[in-house]
C-alpha cells in the first residue's frame, strides 16, 4: 500500500467532543493508520522509545528556546510539529513516560508560550492607569517650572495670597476665586506664604499638571480623605467669589445675604448635578454636569446675572423672595398651608400632600411637618423647570402612588380629579378625564400603551405639560389657551430654560413691586414732613 503524505497543519483540528469521535471511529482509525505510516512518525516513535529506555527527559522547543538533549531543530518531534503550530502533543500517561520524567526533573525546562506572549505584550503596552494621576512629560514639566520660576522670582520667602492669584490663573488655569483654596492646600502649616518648592511639589510632582480641569477642580475642592464633594467643600470658593466679583460687590455690606446667596448656589448645584441625591458629589457626576464651564463663565463675566447657570444673583433673589412671601412668620420654615399659597394657589392639595410626605425627597428640615429653605429650593426648581431630568424624576415619584415605576390610568385619574373639581368650582369649561388621558398619551407616546414610565417622559419634549395638567391649574389653563406672552418669550430667548424664563419674569415683577413700594414710602414721608409745624 502506497503511503499517503499528510500536511501537518491538518492535524491541528478544532477541539472535538468525545461523542462525535465515537460516531466516526472508522475515520479516526484510518487517519491514525495513515499517520503511523509516515516515515517521520517512524523516526519519532523510535526516538521516543530510545529516550524512554535511557531515562532521558523529553524537551520540546516552544516558540522560544528550550534546553535538553533533544531540543532544537534536530529533534524529530520538533521537526514534525513546529512550536509555532501550537503546544506540543501530550504523551500517553504510563510508567517511565516522558511526562513522568518531566515531573521528576521539574517544569523549568519547558517554556510556556503563554508566558512568552505575556512578557512580549507587557513590553508593548505602556502603563495607562495612574492612581495619583499621569506624570507630566519632561517638556511640559520644564515649561511649567520655567513659568513658576518667573512668577516666584524675587520672592525668596514665598508668595502671599494676593500675589498668588496670578499663579492660580496663569499656572493652574482655574477660575481666580480658587486662589484661597489652592493657597491653603499648599500652605499646610498656615504660614501665610507659599514657597516655590512647595507649590512645585503640589502642582507638578503631585501630577495636577496633567489632569483635565474638571479633575483639577474636584481635587482642589475635596477633602484629602474623601473621593466625593460635600456642600461645605464649595463654601471657600463661593466666599472668595463674593469678596472679589464686581457683580456681587454690593452684597459686602450685608453678610447675611452673602450667606444666603452662597447657600442657594450650592443647593442649585446639588439639585442638577448630584443625581444620586445622597449629598456626595462624585467626579463622574461633576464631569457629566456643566458646573466647571459655569465657574469659568462667572470668572470672566463682570455681570453676574448673565451667568444663568447657578450663579445669577437675580435667580437667587427670585428664589429667596418667593420663600419669604410664603414664610409668613419668618421662622425660615414653611408648612403645608404656606406652600398651598404658592403661585396664587396653583397647586392641588393632593400634590402638596405628596411633597410633605417627603416622597420625592426627604426634607433636610429637622422640624416635623415643615420644609426648610433647601427643601424649598429643590421644590421651586422642580416646579418651574419641569423639562429638566431632576424635575421629571421629582414629580414622577409624586404621581407614582405605589412606587412601582410606572404611572397607570388610576394614578393619573387620582390627581386629575382635583383639577377637574377646581375647574367646575371656577365655572370653567371642564375637560373630562378620558379626553385628558388621550391627550397625555399623545404627548408622551409611551412604549407600552397601558402605562407611562420615567423613560417615556424623558424622551418627550412635552413631559412638563403632563404634570401641569395633573396638578397645576394656572399652567394647565395657560397651556390650553396657548398664552401668547409665553410664546413670545420662548421665541425671544430660545436657548433659555423654563427656569430662566420664569426667573426673568418674576424678577421684573418683584422689581416693579419694590419700586412702587419705595415710591409709596417716599410720598408718605413727604406728606408727613408737610404736616410738621416748625417751632
From Swiss-Prot:
Residue ranges of the TM segments: none
UniProt keywords, alphabetically: Calcium, Metal-binding, Repeat
Residues annotated to bind Ca(2+): 400, 402, 404, 411
Family annotation (Gene3D superfamilies): 1.10.238.220, 1.10.238.230, EF-hand (1.10.238.10)
Region annotated Disordered, chain positions: 67-104
An example Gene Ontology molecular-function term: calcium ion binding
Location of the EF-hand domain: 174-209, 387-422
Subunit and interaction comment: PP2A consists of a common heterodimeric core enzyme, composed of a 36 kDa catalytic subunit (subunit C) and a 65 kDa constant regulatory subunit (PR65 or subunit A), that associates with a variety of regulatory subunits. Proteins that associate with the core dimer include three families of regulatory subunits B (the R2/B/PR55/B55, R3/B''/PR72/PR130/PR59 and R5/B'/B56 families) and cell signaling molecules.
Protein function: Probable regulatory subunit of type 2A protein phosphatase.
Protein name: Probable serine/threonine protein phosphatase 2A regulatory subunit B''delta
